[in-house]
Amino acid sequence: MRWLPAFALILSAPAAAAQLLFAGGQWVALDRGGTCEAASRSLRIAQKGKVQARAGFAFDANGARHGQFFAEMSRVPRAGSTVILTVGTQPFMLATTGHWAWSRDPQQEVAIIAAVRAASGMRVDSRDASGRRIIDRYLLDGAPTAIDAAAARCASAKLAKSRRNT
């Protein structure tokens, strides 16, 4: 039953058939065709009609993304507000648009993944338009395996594609 919260993430995924690669702890790894994801939902379950906060790492079979961190926040941050991902005690400033925040560059992505491997939890913090604090918390149990599964699947897809083209 520990995988049930992670499985709920699959059910909320778009109907574009995602193949489950791994489900463990609070995380899943999904193959969505050209994109693979390691993802989780926040600890707080959204009320009906509200946005369910979720976060994860995206990998592309074409190599464009190698573990880009992304987060869909529970509320829209105030315009110009800083969004901080804190993994364990290590902070990372994220780029944002609307409900979404993501890593700024490949070096930051490597640092975030390394921090995830050593921590038990992370949170995404900001302020909304009325100045209220937004805190979306995540457990990292299962995250390293989900990240590895997503990365490996997209790497193998990229390798298979390059072999077909030669």
Task: Report the location of each language-model feature.
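A generic "folded-domain core" signal
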Residues: 17-166
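Bacterial N-terminal signal peptides
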Residues: 4-12
